[in-house]
Amino acid sequence: MTKQQENEQVPGMREQRFGIEIELTGLTRRAAADIIGDYMGTTPVYIGGFYYVYEIPDREGRQWRVVLDNSIKVECKSGIANDEYKVEVVSPICRYPDIPDIQEIVRQLRHGGAIANKSCGIHIHVNATPHNARTLRNITNIMASKEDLIYKALQVEVARKHQYCRPVDETFLDEMNRKKPRNMDEVSLIWYGGRSRRSKHYDKTRYHCLNLHSVFQKGTIEFRLFNSTTHAGKVKAYIHLCLAISYQALIQKCASRRKTTSTNEKYTFRTWLLRLGLIGEEFANTRKHLLEHLDGCIAWKDPAQAERQKERLRARREMEENANQEGKENLEGRDVSNPMTKTGMEEKMEEGKLYVAYGSNLSLTQMRRRCPTARVVGLAELMDYELLFRGRRENAFATIEPKQGSCVPVMIWKIQGDDELALDRYEGYPHL
């Protein structure tokens, strides 16, 4: 198959099929099944069996399931909880437009008393059919390189990290990148370390944040690293993240395994989310939920840049405060009863010069000391320039430099008489 043919078969991010498993307690399996049935307008059917299964058909005839999960520690808001309160909701194979239904089911379950405690998790399965040996190596490297940031962003419980969603296995990672398998059988040999155990449901290799045992057992890539939640927006964010990672693995020629380190986690992770395609208004809440637990500044890569921006904003506020105070003093000193009193515009046009001052280096007090006749007559913006701070700390100074599309807030001072010469000697404050 040529590269072009391979690319033509890759589904878009929103075209991938997926499923979700949500572990909960706080209500019984029967109550959860009834809530889903009420939302779908259908009647749950008790199937029974080892997992005490309830099946609930949706509007398209697909089956939602509510089953027992013995890893859940039960609790309820009132009374005594028993094993009936071990609830796992399993979706059918879903499409991207099904996400709002999944969110509403989560909301209805929360209203019905559902609790997501520390023993509960969420597993998301993405269809593995479009993937091959190369893309599975890509997704392994993507997860290995970003897993430290992902664990922190998702606030994965320490117990879950060490038991049910361990990091990518280093031996598997090394072998995948050293051998570069060409087909799925070769990937299977590396994953299991020998003979395939795909028929075993509870194989020990499944308990990783990226579970490829699921690829060989049921044809899905499983992401196991999410704490369970009854927050519908977070559930949507988790689905978006899994679909985006899977899609990135499909379209990239290769991916680096190198660990991502950063002095500004929030900026680094946000940049990665944008590269994954989680950009624009549609994914605004997704980015919000995935970034809220990370440290750093979202807007600036270098923390020093953020500090300089704060200084620029502080300078602008000081200019505005000085201008307002000067204007207030001018109004208080004006004889408003005299109809011949000059208006502000007329005063600006009388003999003298108008000067522009940027930043806060030349405050009202300093200007008055240099030029006793100085006063603020307005605020403006200097177009196609930017305000920069040169030097470090106590030696820093402000300057403006040309930059297309930018603007610098400035104060307009009025200077008269001999004071013009004093200000002309002060470098950086040109008159208009």
Enumerate the predicted regions with their spans.
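Short, conserved phosphate-binding/catalytic loop or strand-edge motifs used
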Residues: 118-122, 126
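C-terminal accessory/tail domains of diverse enzymes
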Residues: 2-115, 129-346
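Short, surface-exposed loop/turn motifs at beta-strand boundaries within globular domains
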Residues: 15-17, 117, 360, 380
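Short, well-ordered loop/turn elements at secondary-structure boundaries
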Residues: 119, 217, 350-352
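Beta-hairpin (beta-strand-turn-beta-strand) motif
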Residues: 69-71, 92-94, 127-129, 412-418, ...
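A generic alpha-helix preference that emphasizes hydrophobic side chains
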Residues: 33, 121-122, 220, 270, ...
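Glycine-aromatic micro-motifs
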Residues: 344-432
